[in-house]
From Swiss-Prot:
This is Deoxyguanosinetriphosphate triphosphohydrolase-like protein. One of its GO terms (biological process) is dGTP catabolic process. It comes from the Bacteria. SMART domains: HDc (SM00471). Residues 7-27 have a biased composition (Basic and acidic residues).
Amino acid sequence: MTSSVWQERRHGEDKQRRNDHRSPYQRDRARILHSAAFRRLQAKTQVLGVGMNDFYRTRLTHSLEVSQIGTGIAAQLRRKYPQHKQLLCSMSLLESLCLAHDIGHPPFGHGGEVALNYMMRDHGGFEGNGQTFRILSKLEPYTLDFGMNLCRRTMLGILKYPAPHSKLFVAGKHSEITNHRQLKPSQWPPVKGIFDDDNDIFAWVLEPLSEADRSRFTSTQQGSHPALHHYPHLRTQFKSFDCSIMELADDIAYAVHDLEDAIVMGIVTASQWHQDVAPTLTNSGDAWIRQELADIGNKLFSHEHHLRKDAIGTLVNGFVTAIVISEDDVFEEPLLRFNATLEPEFAIALNVLKQLVYKYVIRKPEIQMLEYKGQQIVMGLFEAFASDPERLLPLNTQERWRESEQQGLNSHRVLADYISGMTDEFAGRLYQQLFSPKAGSNVELSKEM
């Protein structure tokens, strides 16, 4: 049984609302769902914000799908493992994690993330998951100083990479650039961890753990990255039980639903599927994969909409029902001792789908050009604001910047907070206002700032 200490909030609350019988995790879910940071996801594209097609997913619709898959995983595990029903005590908790998992991602996806990481290279770096942790615990104005003031277990679940930047960062041999246009993302991969500026919250989240559990949970190892030949930084090794479900749901949504977008838009073809995916499925060591998925490409690439949707449903169902609970008995705390994992053959199949999306969608020159453009916009905005914060920042952000300066804190983090919260469209228009001679009045922009 998990301890009640995991339901505690950093800032104690004594709100007594009339006839409010919601659980702590139902309250967490409501706070996330009604937050401005969550709403902004509707204007941040997931992968395919290309052209005039309105079919593609945004980060908001992606997060809703991750939530649906996450609760589906939990329901399956409750049936398979009745002995673990205490671990799976709240669907609202898992919904909260899935809905919130992308809240910290900046405008223009990976391009914006790399740009902010480069501009913050001497000030603690930038990474989307670290920013999510920061928004939930400090920035979103549900409370004055404690962000959404979520339960400790919710904050533990959002920690995909439970170690601070300083413990993971390895100084690399970067090529010096004289112009922002020369920046190569492969040379500036973000450190996957939380920011040192948020170590106080990190320590509070891990407070209930034994010293041994805390030490092992935050331990690191030499990193690797599927998109990079050499990832220079260290990586974390562990995540909580709730986080493992959220991450699997995210992976399934990314691999299956982003693939669906790409098929509909003609970016991934049947011949590419048969070349890159079909052989792995046909030769799988799992009988269900061989029988059900080997020929699924015919449905996926059918012009009959209902056949394609049926195939997508089959893929999602296959992965969700192949998830098991594994145990690592080195941990004492049940939330760390147990993790949700995919059966090995299904993990191979999911990875093949993810690689297909990466190869033909993410690396597509048109997508990379959009990322590059976003990269330039974000770096240009950061450079401008850093040059004269008290002149160019909105008044409320100026105040945060001044407070940070006066307290001897990392004032550059305030700039990263402001820019990372922008939508793609707002960042683009603000860039035009600052740098284009033909841009119009600032009145409309000022209303949004």
